[in-house]
């Protein structure tokens, strides 16, 4: 997968000097134990670093500034061991530009009825401190996440892990650079949008480059690199020549490998992590990138067809959140409207990420009527079963909106011998009819990101961080 920062999260424990040094030492000891055991749980995707017991406005402000300035810090986790006067948190919290998690927990998960006294109550008053602290976050309109429960429980740790993935995706969003080779497909509305506003709101840089600049990189790829990659792919996938001569099959597959290396070098040299192509502008290329795009998506690059830079950036963003697992560019195509069989068949002309393949992908070469170029090689496979979210983004003039619904992924009821593309079947969980009406009413697009590794709660959390309107169609 494309590399991201080696992120960590800082743990800040709230208290106050009123309780004395002995109590504060106990607070620090307990906080360090929580951090140590959370890191040892193997439930969290990123490490937590204990920073301090925060007792004054000055030390709170200082640590929040430090979190901002350290690029490897993805967010701050706060816990109120005791009561912590919330006015102390105002300045630092206002300055904090990283995601914030309020962990509403307690060091012990029970009340020691036989031994409890007021010293114990003073030390273990998270329920008291949580309410004071949560008020100031709400008063500041902080858009922070709150997770409540015992820190040692697996469900709480899994909730923290999901939030960590959201926080990292948020940080990485401001590094996403999309290259569009040619403009978007002519006369299409939903794939258009305000690139300046996208950079202001999400941090996305979107640059146009002419196809000729890509062609130069493609033509410069060495035969040795192509031959080596061809041999590697023969080990990983089934090669099916079909109606092609052996010479034509090998040539067309190797040309996609040439495009793969050309695209990869072009992006890596310039810092791009997502890209779009357009079948209307392929001057100088023999084929529309198919297998090439699929191989790059499998490595974590974002992609969308027809110049759809929003979906390409969203694809990259959700791949980061999902650790590049089971998260793919997708398009709604054909419906099964029979009662009891309701489903959407999703695919694209060529470019569906093999991370959702339920069978061994096959490398095949077939004609493509669109684009007026040579027959492109592509990976052909059937998608998977399971719970997923289907996500899209559109620009409505006055705002961007993120939209999704929960779906159930299924396999087709029968083979499709005349459909030589990757395909995925799914049904909205609220029903095909209800889901379609909800999607169409809000104006959801035909290009989406389908993920079996991200859920709607994470999309809601991400939208809060961006102050982005999120429509969860139910």
Curated annotation (Swiss-Prot):
Cellular component annotations (GO), alphabetically ordered: cytosol
Superkingdom field: Bacteria
Free-text cofactor note: Binds 1 Mn(2+) ion per subunit.
Catalytic activity annotation: beta-L-arabinopyranose = L-ribulose
Pfam families recorded: AraA_central, AraA_N, Arabinose_Iso_C
Required cofactor(s): Mn(2+)
Protein EC: 5.3.1.4
SUPFAM superfamilies hit by this protein: FucI/AraA C-terminal domain-like (SSF50443), FucI/AraA N-terminal and middle domains (SSF53743)
Keyword match Metal-binding: yes
Pathway where it operates: Carbohydrate degradation; L-arabinose degradation via L-ribulose; D-xylulose 5-phosphate from L-arabinose (bacterial route): step 1/3
Biological processes, Gene Ontology terms: L-arabinose catabolic process to xylulose 5-phosphate
Keywords: Arabinose catabolism, Carbohydrate metabolism, Isomerase, Manganese, Metal-binding
Residues that coordinate or bind Mn(2+): 306, 331, 348, 447
A GO MF label: L-arabinose isomerase activity
Keyword Metal-binding included in the entry's annotation: yes
EC category name: isomerase
Task performed by this protein: Catalyzes the conversion of L-arabinose to L-ribulose.
Family affiliation: Belongs to the arabinose isomerase family.
Listed name of the protein: L-arabinose isomerase
Classification lineage: Bacteria, Bacillati, Bacillota, Bacilli, Lactobacillales
